[in-house]
Curated annotation (Swiss-Prot):
Comp. bias (Polar residues): 46-66
WD repeats: 99-139, 237-287, 289-331
Function of the molecule: Required for the formation of N(7)-methylguanine at position 46 (m7G46) in tRNA. In the complex, it is required to stabilize and induce conformational changes of the catalytic subunit.
GO biological process: tRNA (guanine-N7)-methylation
Family: Belongs to the WD repeat TRM82 family.
Protein name, entry field: tRNA (guanine-N(7)-)-methyltransferase non-catalytic subunit trm82
Keywords: Nucleus, Repeat, tRNA processing, WD repeat
Organism of derivation: Aspergillus oryzae (strain ATCC 42149 / RIB 40) (Yellow koji mold)
One cellular-component annotation, GO: tRNA methyltransferase complex
Amino acid sequence: MAANFQLPLQCLQYLEKRGAESQRFLIASSGGKIYSYAAETGQRLSSWPQDVDASNANNSKATETETGSEDQAPPEKKRKVSPSEEGPAETSKSTVKASTWSSIPCLVAHSNGDYVIALTAEDKCVRVLRLKDDGTLEQLSERCMPKRPCSIALTDDGNTILCGDKFGDVYSLPLLPGNEPYVAPKLPNRPKVPSATPLTVHSKRNLESLEQQLRYSQKNSTEEKNSLNFQHQLLLGHVSLLTDVAFVTVPQDDNFGKKRSYILTGDRDEHIRVSRYPQAHIIEGYCLGHTAFVTKLCIPQYAPGYLISGGGDDYLLVWKWSEGRILQKVPLVKQESETTQVTVRGIWATSIGGSNIVLVALEGSSNLQCFVLGSDGTLKPQDPIEMSGNVLDVAIMEKDSTIVVSVDCIREKGSTHEWRASPTSPSNLIESFRVKPGTENLEWEPVTESLVTNINMGGSSGIPADADTKQRKELNDVLYSLGNLRKKHGEDD
C-alpha cells in the first residue's frame, strides 16, 4: 500500500486576540478544512468543519431522504439550493452536516483576532467564523454569492466585508448580519424579446428559432427574479474578470485632516481602478502600466500612499496610487535565464527589525523574494529565501520578527503539475524564518522551534501517492490556477 502525501496548507493567517491576556493563533486552510494552532507551540487546537461520525451521517441521510420524498425531489438535489431560496444560514453549530466544497482558497483574519472570514469555493459561500479563546472555530453565518468570489477584504473598522467576484462585481456585506430577518425585494424579471419578427425572418430554420425564442420570453415574463436573501450592496463593477480587492484609508492633505477611504481593484485586462468608498461609483482614477493581467495588490500599512502590484508580467510596479504614477519597475527574473512565464502569487508587506519589508512569491517557485521599501517608495532587492517546496502563502508574526511560510510538499520544486516520487515523513507543511539581528543587509535564519515541528508532525489530510491522473490534475488546479488568466494568442484584449 502506497504511503500518503499530506495536503498542503493553502492559506495561512496569524491572529492575536486582544484582551487582558494576549492569545496568539495560526489559522490554516487545507483542502476543505480549516485548522487552528497555538502560535507558540504549534499544537493543533481544532479543525472546522468537525468530522461527522457514522451514526450522525446515517441520521442526516435519513432526514434528507424524508425531506426529499415530501418535496417530490431526489435527495441529492436538496444539497444544492440557490442563495435566494436558502438565504443566509446563520448557526452557532461548529459542526457542518455535509461539506459541499473541497477547497478554501481565501482566508482573512479580523484585526481584533475574534473572527475569520473564509471563502468556500464550490458553493460560492462567504463564511464568518468566531475564533474562541480555546482555539475552536464556530460558524456564525454563511452567505452564498451569485457568482464565484475571488477576493475578500475588510474595511478598516472591521465591520464590513468587501467581496469581489470573477464577473467583475464588488459587494459589501456586514461582518455580522443583524438580528432582524432580512426581507429580500422581489424584482420583476425583464423579458428578453427578440428584435426579429416573422416579417424579417424567411427561412424555415430561422422561423422555428424565432418561435422558440418567443415562447421562452413569454414563459419567463410571468416569473419573478429573487435577489440575494441577505443584507448586501453592490458597490462597483468591472467589465473584465476581477482578480483582487484592496482597501485603504488615508488622511487628506488639507487643513482639516479629513480621512478618505478607497477601494482598489485589479482585473484581467491589466487595469487597476481606484474608487471612492462608500461612493464607489466615483472613480478617482486608474493605475495603468501592466501589460498582462493583475493578480495582487499590496498597500503597506506603514506606507499607505504606495501600492505594489504584480501579475502576469515579469516585474512589479510600485505606484503613487493616488496620482496613478509609476515610481519604479522592479524585475522579478533575470531576462537571460527566463524560461517560463511569470505569475505573481502573493505580495506581503511587513515591518520587522526596523526594516520595511516586502515579500513576493511567484506561482510554482520555491524562492520567496525579499525587498526593502525605502522612504522614497523604491524597492531594494535582498537575497531570496529558498524553501523546500513551492511557496503557497505567508503569515507574519511581527513581534517575533518571524515569518511562517506554507510550502507545497507534494509537487516538485519549480513545478505546478509534476508530483514527487514519494512523500516524506513528516511532510514539510510549513517553514519558518527569523530576521538576523545586527546585519547590514536583510538576512534570514531558519526557525526550528516547536511551532514548525508540531504542525509538520500533525499533518493534514492524506492523499494517496498513487492517485490517478484525473485526481492529480484536480488537485493541481486547486492550487495553481492563476496562469489560466493569461490570454491565449489571438484572444481579444
